[in-house]
Amino acid sequence: MGACLGACSLLSCASCLCGSAPCILCSCCPCSHNSTLSRLFFTVFLFLGVLVCVIMLSPGVESQLYKLPWVCNEGTGSHVVLQGHIDCGSLLGHRAVYRMCFAMAAFFFLFSLLMVCVRSSRDPRAAIQNGFWFFKFLIFVGITVGAFYIPDGSFSNIWFYFGVVGSFIFLLIQLLLLIDFAHSWNQRWLCKAEECDSRAWYAGLFFFTLLFYALSITAVALLFVYYTQPGACYEGKVFIGLNLTLCVCVSIVAILPKIQDAQPNSGLLQASVITLYTMFVTWLALSNVPDQKCNPHLLTHFGNGTVLAGPEGYETHWWDAPSIVGLVVFILCTVFISLRSSDHRQVNSLMQTEECPPVLDATQQQVVSEGRAFDNEQDGVTYSYSFFHLCLVLASVHIMMTLTNWYRPGETRKMISTWTAVWVKICASWTGLLLYLWTLVAPLLLPNRDFS
């Protein structure tokens, strides 16, 4: 009898994995909307891939595998499996990260194409989006295995340029999310101040605004100290000075009387967040300057005693501070994409989302009280399925560039830092500032449109 009950329990779990609606772990999620849970589960797939990439980049993993003669082949072949052994050089390091991230991007791109023009959960494709997680996992694993059988050839070099473009776009998405976050934060605290008739909320906004600007000024000083030299590093000096000037200009525009009249919720908090993010992107750009005099991280990667030489003679490296901070920012932004519920109309338009609290009938209220997922998209989807998966495609290529520190695979299998990475990040910072400036002046330039 116990065995039968256990089998029934397993079949119940299997139905959750293979069915058209998620139910595992839903009791742990307050207000379990299908729209939110599905995004979270897809994000888990992304984080699993990132975890595999981190393991593949670990400097101790490859050396330990080579101690097992029955596992690794010490040759330099381009295939993964050779005469019953594994070419560990293909399974580890930057080449492996390229393949793993290619698999993730292909997986999410497949769903992006599949979910085009899904308008509500009544579309049969919505059941695929919100369920069948076991089969999705099998597809994910299958694509990953296939990616490791791609011959070396020019794959890494071609995929590098895909990563450059995708990462540029994702940097802009991160900035849009920060605009959304800062706007929501500012609006909620202002509402709290009016409701409670307390100046503590205003003091809190002032404190964090001052903190973010102080961090930005500190970042500028540190960038000048560590990434410039007297009589050299002119590009870095121009980038730092120009971005600082642009941030000051944007901050002034944010508090102009006409801007305040058109957008009462705009202010220095949002501008301070954007300024800090711009300094962060500037730091990422300068960490890729291919000049040892102007880039201390380049010395770390290629200095004496700090480079790990693989069995094929190419050089690998472990992460530096920009890579670690970039990974943390990536994780936070990806989670925010999955959980965001925004009331910023301009950001919603750019992000193709319009998250509205659903009106629950009696049956749905009972489902919520029981801790199960319920369908809140019968009358219309709360976000664009296809665009969400496209964001995860961009996230996949961005994390590939972050983990490999934007180094381009060279003919000698060394990872080479190039000016391409520098200019892409600097241009992303300029484009991001222009996007934020547009959110400020759009109501003035287009008075006939509703930006409320």
From Swiss-Prot:
As for family, the record states: Belongs to the TDE1 family.
**Alphabetized UniProt keyword annotations:** Cell membrane, Membrane, Transmembrane, Transmembrane helix
- Coiled coil, from the record: none
Any one GO biological process: plasma membrane phospholipid scrambling
Q: Does the keyword Nuclease apply?
A: no
Its membrane topology is listed as:
Multi-pass membrane protein
Main location as per UniProt: membrane
Record field: catalytic activity: a 1,2-diacyl-sn-glycero-3-phospho-L-serine(in) = a 1,2-diacyl-sn-glycero-3-phospho-L-serine(out); a 1,2-diacyl-sn-glycero-3-phosphocholine(in) = a 1,2-diacyl-sn-glycero-3-phosphocholine(out); a 1,2-diacyl-sn-glycero-3-phosphoethanolamine(in) = a 1,2-diacyl-sn-glycero-3-phosphoethanolamine(out)
* GO MF: phospholipid scramblase activity
Which cellular compartments is it found in?
Cell membrane
Transmembrane spans? 5-25, 41-61, 96-116, 131-151, 158-178, 205-225, 236-256, 266-286, 319-339, 387-407, 426-446
- Do you know which InterPro entries this protein is assigned to? TDE1/TMS (IPR005016)
Per the record, the domain of life is Eukaryota
Q: What is the name of the protein in this document?
A: Serine incorporator 2
**A GO CC term attached to the entry:** plasma membrane
Protein role = Non-ATP-dependent, non-specific lipid transporter for phosphatidylserine, phosphatidylcholine, and phosphatidylethanolamine. Functions as a scramblase that flips lipids in both directions across the membrane. In contrast to SERINC3 and SERINC5, has no effect on gammaretrovirus particles infectivity.
